[in-house]
Design a protein with these regions (language model features):
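Conserved helicase NTPase catalytic core signature
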Residues: 1-59, 73
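Conserved helicase motor core of SF1/SF2 NTP-dependent helicases
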Residues: 30, 44-46, 51-343
Length: 343
């Protein structure tokens, strides 16, 4: 369910409009939809097709990335209350990674209505997933965590696992997770120089050059199987730094590298690459506050942006930044210390 503009060409033939194009009678349309056991689409796309609920009953709805979806966005699906409603919802998400983007300040989206507060709805910026998760202890509902991860090599996952997940993450044991690390650096830090006073705080030429140099080395080591959509990605917090990194990479004269994704951590959530380079682009102490997204659980401080950035890589994770600024933050200091001893 969706638009051809946002659907990969390989799957456009399965879009509901294309599947129903050959139907000449309403009965044919009904039969085709009734016989379709699985429908896939974004929350917006499914909500925009209310006629589906008049034609078909759904036993289960699985909502992926549920922590990035606000409650009102789910209402159209949750409130289908007739006989053709959805029997059961499964919300899958990670509240320790980035939430939905809300432009309002927390004070503006805060809830003061006693009825809503009684059901745990304290702020409109929170997802239904978070509210239900927070309410579990109060209403004595059981909850658990999916611990097996098939993305990261254990050494790549080491910091995030210890700092944010209490050491509970267990590798599935896929081939890339069991590869030897004897001749490969899984986690490495490359110190950069801060920009001079008076310059833009949102660019760092030293880091851009480091990123380009690493990209060239990675391309050379993967020349025979380099895939711009799979092998390498670069994360950095500012658009200005993205443009600078792209310029430095373009100067290398390697066409394949010009097609790699260089973007913010928000745009990378849900994506993965074999190798990720993270350009922190912190040129002053105060910037650390703006590039973090902090939350706390059971007394443990969690930086959701840092967590996302460090969990995008399958095989290797490289970080570059100014050590003296990064070490002023306890989480970044712990990361650098771990890389120094384990990386």
């Amino acid at each position: 369910v969706g638009s051809e503009l946002s659907c990969d060409e390989a799957y456009r033939g399965h879009l509901i409009e294309n599947e129903l194009a050959s139907c000449t009678r309403r009965a044919d349309v009904y039969e085709r939809i009734r016989n379709c056991r699985i429908m896939v689409g974004t929350v917006a796309a499914i909500s925009g097709k209310p006629e589906l609920f008049r034609l078909k009953h759904f036993d289960v709805a699985i909502v992926d990335e549920a922590t990035q979806i606000l409650e009102p966005q789910l209402l159209g699906i949750l409130c289908a209350g007739d006989r053709n409603a959805i029997d059961k919802f499964i919300l899958i998400g990670d509240h320790k990674q980035l939430p939905a983007v809300v432009l309002q300040k927390a004070e503006q989206s805060a809830i003061y209505d006693e009825t809503l507060l009684a059901i745990g709805l304290t702020n409109l910026k929170d997802s239904l997933f978070e509210r239900l998760y927070r309410n579990c202890p109060a209403v004595h509902r059981s909850h658990d965590m999916l611990c097996r991860q098939g993305r990261m090599h254990p050494k790549v996952a080491l910091f995030a696992n210890r700092a944010f997940y209490g050491g509970h993450l267990i590798p599935v044991g896929l081939s890339h997770q069991t590869e030897s690390s004897e001749h490969i650096s899984r986690l490495a830090f490359y110190p950069s120089q801060p920009e001079k006073a008076g310059g833009s705080a949102k660019i760092n030429y030293s880091e851009a050059r480091i990123v380009a140099g690493l990209a060239a080395q990675i391309y050379e080591s993967h020349r025979t199987d380099f895939d711009d959509s799979r092998t390498l990605g670069v994360i950095t917090p500012y658009r200005s730094q993205i443009a600078l990194i792209k310029k430095e990479i373009e100067a290398l004269g390697i066409p394949a590298l010009n097609r790699i994704l260089v973007d913010t951590v928000e745009r990378f959530q849900g994506s993965e690459r074999d190798v990720i380079i993270y350009s922190c682009c912190i040129n002053s102490y105060y910037q650390l506050k703006f590039v973090s997204n902090l939350t706390e659980e059971n007394g443990v401080l969690i930086d959701r942006k840092l967590n996302v950035a460090l969990t995008r890589a399958r095989k290797q994770m490289f970080v570059t930044g100014v050590p003296k600024y990064l070490k002023s933050n306890p989480l970044y200091e712990s990361l650098l210390n771990l890389i120094e001893t384990q990386g």
